[in-house]
Amino acid sequence: MKANGQASHKYLKALAGEMGADVSDLIALSYDNDPYYIGRPSHRELAEWFQGIWRQRGFEGRGGVHLRRVHQRRVHYQLLGAAKHDGRPYENITTDWNYLLKASRYARILGLVNPEDIIDRRNPEPHVYFYRPDDEQEKGFEPHIPGFDLPAPDTDLLSWLEENLKHPHLSPTGYDYDDFSQPYHVEVWVEKSTMNDILQPLCEELSTNLAVGVGYMTITSVVALLRRIEASGKPTRILYVSDFDKAGRNMPKAVARQTEFWSAMYAPDADIRLQPIVLTQDQIDKYDLPSLNIFDDGDEAPDDVVELDALEARVPGELASIVRENIERFRDKELSERFTQAKEGAQKMLDEQLAEHLADDIKRLDELKEEARPTIERYERLLEMLAARLERELEPLQVSLNEVRHAIEESVTALEPPLPDPPQPVATDPDDDGWLFDSSREYMDQLKHYKTPKQWQEMQAAMRSRHKVCAECGTSFVTTRKVRGRRYCDRNCRQRAHRRRQREYHQRKREAKKG
């Protein structure tokens, strides 16, 4: 399913009915946070309110390539005293600020406001090192044909002769290695900026984009990611780095879910996968990392938090090593050398082709150069005095050289050498089934990867228990969680069964009287 907004909400409701599932089974986040479920009346009320004030304040249409995008904090202060969707005044309090953020998010998810109209200052700009070069070249060649001009008066005419009557040559194009030639677009996403001193130089070295967030990544960050993916045109692998705590475990899922949702609009054909790589329980156990016990509101027991900083403090350099190892899984280490070899092979082929096609022209060029040499040697000594005479005597040769150059140009234009294709990157995509998010998966297959095996098995068992056979007509039907005791597929069958039982009851009474 690749649906947006209200269509997604309706789709999930219908799908839940068909499968005998509760809607909560078919979403990966909470009702108010999963973009595929946004579209309930309460969501739409807030979204339409935000759309109205967005238009009223003149903010619409500032996104995309425009520079004057709007930050929501500015909207907050402009709204003070204005009416909220329920008529109550908007105040300068945290509750109303969160109300605005929620309404803004719903409006963008439902397509009422362009996500790119809103600027994101909560998260810093990503460090982009992997991008398509502006001067990317296709396979081919560029001719280099000198002007073949004989010298005008100079003090060093023989050197001028050698320099300007060189043999023509061809240079292959499209064989220069660039990191953009690598097979994958890789990004490292990290929840906190305290690791920038480690990750930024590493990502720059490996031409890997680095996106740093403060807590949960925003819709703006995800849309910007999809813009980069669409521009690169390459399969994308997102490596997620976070603390190990309740929030850290949910953050990759939240980013994956937002990416899954918005990719339908911004990169529908993209191959995107996301996987948390740091911190994991195995890494915590391996390095014996200490945890902080933090109580969340309402928790009866503390939530164990292990910070990224603990890994770097206990095992200096290990974070960089883990990230480097994961990035290099998607890089072709021999690609640069193969580009060099391919360019050398193409150059050799061009040299051979040019020598074969221009043999007569080059021979004539050398003859003309030798014919010019004695004249130049003689007039070099008398240059100042005999400049005018030199020009007159060389004029016939210049005409001949122009003819040779014209002939060479025609021959080069007709060349169609069978140049080898530039090397294609080769990299194995490891652990094909182990990715938390894969854009090629269907909706239910992807949902399975968001659930734990136990959650998935429980959901399947619950759905099976809701599939019933009508006790009256024998038709299969699906009941809901609230009325699992239903025996009949619809009201008509229930009434028919009731009437049949009444007839049987009265029949038994009549038979009893006769007996």
Where are these regions (language model features)?
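Nucleic-acid enzyme cleavage-core boundary/entry regions
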Residues: 1-236, 249-458
